Amino acid sequence: IGAPYFNKVTKINDKKSGILFLPSLTLFQEMTENLKECNHLYLNKYWKLYEFINIDKKKLIKFKLFNHPRSKILKNLWLRKTNKSIKFEYRNYKGNINKKFKLTVIDNFSTPLFELIYNSYPFIIINDSKQNEFTNEFKKILNHLKSLNILFDSEKKAADFINKNYNDIDSWWNKIIKKKKFKIIKKSLFSIKEFNNSKFVNSFAYQLAKGDNKIS
């Protein structure tokens, strides 16, 4: 994952609205805790977040949930509990969902995180991981995200942030992407800003012609 994967995404400047819930934990249901969260509404962090958001805000905000096919149980629970006020997205999210929303909420450190950072789309993360399995370098990135008010360890804290800042998300985000810590994060994750396909193909062809299997 990196510049070769994301650099062909076409950016648009259309007016964005609403919040997209983009869960990744649904992709890892083999883990017991994740299985419980994916299929039990009251254990699901997106439901907790939705409940904590002010009633007045919920009347104004357009919510969409990117629902993984395996989460039919969760979908039915959402529809019943919200009186069908939340919409579901099923499209491939690469490059054509995040950019349409005022804010994206993710719950894991997987592909959506890298795409959002690469394209500088406004987002927050809700994750209470103890970070034991991460490298020291990635832990530094997570600490930067936390200090920028992008990473939250509880649904209540994330909801408080949304309640306070939703109307000014664009202004907040424009300040975030100019901050030194965000630039450090982006540089750490994407040392190559843009992937040069022609250069790669030419280099590959040259090495093949030489009979050298090492690509420079």
For each feature predicted by the language model, list its residue ranges:
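Conserved catalytic-core segment of nucleotide-activated headgroup transferases in glycan assembly
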Residues: 4-80
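Short acidic alpha-helix that forms the nucleotide-activated donor recognition element
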Residues: 91-101
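Soluble or luminal CAZymes and related metallo-dependent hydrolases
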Residues: 38-48, 150, 157, 196, ...
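Active-site donor-binding acidic/aromatic loop of nucleotide-activated sugar
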Residues: 83-92
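Residues at the C-termini of beta-strands that transition into short coil/loop
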Residues: 2-4, 23, 65, 92, ...
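Structural motif
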Residues: 18, 102-103
